Amino acid sequence: MKLLVVSGGRHPYEESTPVLEGFLKGAGHNVTVTDDPSVLADSGAMGGYDALVFNTLRAGDTTLSDAEQNGMKDFISGGKGFICVHISGVVPETWQEYLEITGGGWVMGTSYHPPYGNYTVNVTQPGHPGVAGVSDFDTDDELYMGIDYQDGNDVYMTGTSEDGTWPWGGKDTFMAGGTFPLGWTRSYGDGKVF
């Protein structure tokens, strides 16, 4: 499969993107990585890819242009794939339709997470292709909370957190525990979002 990975933004992508690229190549994919999202506006170039992978933060001064947004929407809704990794789900204030594409995303000023720590990832649909051969596992990561989830997501993986009070935004903040979706698929037009 030919994959385009869009990287860059305010996060340590210089560390995570090479790991992601190695993983995807190791799985047999043909991978192109770019920090320049202008390719999204080039339908000819995008037509050469099977799926778009976002390992990027495109909000604030790095928000996609209207042409890039439209190119991305056309690519996905036209039947291609879109994989949104980690904080790539941040919903830009000026592009709320992104939430419809991703099915859920970090909302600046509303979403949060407890400190980086260990929690169990539960595979809720062992037969789902997104977790084929994977069983529950422990990980060290941030468990996102306060995410704006949309209807129509086919959730196959969750994480659980206890209630707690942690520093957030310069003050101690109560964070209600619960079970939160971590991985899902959904449709956007004729495309598949993962």
List the model feature ranges, each with a label.
Residues A59-G133:
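A glycine-rich, often tryptophan-bearing local segment used as a flexible ligand/cofactor-contacting loop or short
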Residues S16-P18, W95-Y98, P167-G170:
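Short aromatic-enriched loop/helix-cap "lid" or pocket-rim segments at secondary-structure transitions
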Residues V5, L57-R58, G105-W106, P167-K171:
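Short secondary-structure boundary micro-motifs
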Residues M46-D50, Q96-E97, G152-T158:
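Conserved long hydrophobic alpha-helices within structured protein cores
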Residues K2-P92:
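Helical hinge/lid and interdomain linker segments adjacent to catalytic or ligand-binding clefts
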Residues T110-K192:
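Catalytic beta-strand/loop cores that center a nucleophilic Ser/Cys/Thr
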Residues G8, N55, G81, G103-G104, ...:
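Glycine-centered flexibility motif
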